[in-house]
């Protein structure tokens, strides 16, 4: 790890210090408040037993993205259409993101890129479908990939014309496995590097599945062929959105392994289609919990991708909620833009750790009481 961003001590820099520091400085002060965009998707890879801890059962994992999206949009309610599914330990990172969205008053857009169950009315339909399991080598049709790319490109143009910069987040259960597959398909060694919702990353299981999917790929496959074979709908939408938005504004890809894979995919598409690539405009932002996960080593993946990676130093050791303190034991690490929202809080409001913990604790108080 390189160290801290000099102008914002609560932000750490894992890779790409020069670009990361310059990017942080450009987005540090009001009135340059961003919009938060969260793209929800689904891959049937998530139904494989043991593949993810983001929902205890395959049935739970089908609603995880919908529940996280609902909590982002509506916050605490007397009743939920999709209640947050129980985790092995800890609280959904949607709790962090929602608390910080409220405190910063960020505009929010939640997109359905392909979900297995009906979305909420507030979610923007992109006309996608869930991806099949990556082991089939036919996760998405070429037509669906082209459609999702156009949707992402169009929304990237629209949003970048309305906001000075964008935080783009995701929720895809099983998405670190498709991230591993996408990186490998693009020629980037990623085995044993991607994160996991499990306390100890399940690298062996992921690698076995990815090998089955990659076996279907022809030699020298182009990026669209790769993602159609082994990817998920979020990857296509976010890569297009970020690539288009970065022509005119800054982009924070809020996540870990999945967003590093999206960064690599977007760059590969830019090279393949001879589109402008603005690396100074795009950084990946995550959490300290993921950076310090010795079973993942995503900083090594970021180095291989040559992707600037920053992270919040947020620490819940002194939280009054056991579900938040569980983050310090590695039970939950990142998701739904939690790291990116915290980074925005450091940049825009100058919040230190105690202030940010208090903001999240106060929402957790209400959540624990169901009000």
From Swiss-Prot:
Molecular function terms in GO for this entry? Answer: nicotinate-nucleotide-dimethylbenzimidazole phosphoribosyltransferase activity
UniProt-listed InterPro entries:
Nict_dMeBzImd_PRibTrfase (IPR003200), Nict_dMeBzImd_PRibTrfase_arc (IPR002805), Nict_dMeBzImd_PRibTrfase_sf (IPR036087)
Q: Which HAMAP family match?
A: UPF0284
Q: Could you say which protein family the record assigns here?
A: Belongs to the UPF0284 family.
The protein in question is named UPF0284 protein tll2306
